[in-house]
Amino acid sequence: SGKGGIPAVIRVGSETTFPPFEFTEDDKYVGFDLDLADAIIKQMGSKMEFKSMGFDALIPAVQSGQIDMIAAGLDATPERAKQVAFSDVYFKDNGYCIVVRKDNTTINDWADLAGKNVGAQVGTYQVKLAQEAKAAEVKQLDSNSQAWMELQANTLDAVVIDQPVAM
């Protein structure tokens, strides 16, 4: 244990296909959320131990004690707030967007997702948005990287994602 009952090491979990917040660069985990978590933990006099995991595993990992905190673009929904404590909001994004291939001519807004095959990362609010848009199938993918590959392979018509990540 560290000073004042603060652990010497704080275990941080994240899903690392969410640039610019969490991603892999030159075989290292980097990004805004990780830098912020590391700075806060250093200020506390502790060291950060990082664990990469699936987005849908983050809350269960905190609940089971595998990690101490989450550093990720995790929307503070009422359902999630019943399971874990949230910090103050430190980044407010401009919402969600639809990503399509360049050759797309039929999807221009949310209503156009009806009857289409749409991808979204498992465990995210975007899954709910795609379902509400009455997509024929909402494919829940393990990572944003997988979503981009499926979109390029033409197995998805669109991907719903946070706007900063899509940019």
Regions picked out by a protein language model, each given a short descriptive name:
Residues 45-47, 63-72, 116-117, 136, ...:
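Alpha-to-beta junction loops
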Residues 24, 37-46, 109-110, 123-143:
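Ligand-binding cleft/hinge of the Venus flytrap
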Residues 100-117:
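Flexible hinge/capping segments at coil-to-helix
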Residues 73-83, 129-132, 157-167:
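A ligand-binding cleft/hinge motif common to bilobed small-molecule-binding domains
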Residues 34, 49-61, 105, 139-153, ...:
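Short helix-initiation/N-cap motifs at beta->coil->alpha
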Residues 5-74:
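Extracytoplasmic small-molecule ligand-binding "clamshell" domains
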Residues 16, 74-75, 102, 122, ...:
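Short secondary-structure boundary segments
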Residues 84-97, 114:
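Short Pro/Gly-enriched coil loops immediately N-terminal to beta-strands
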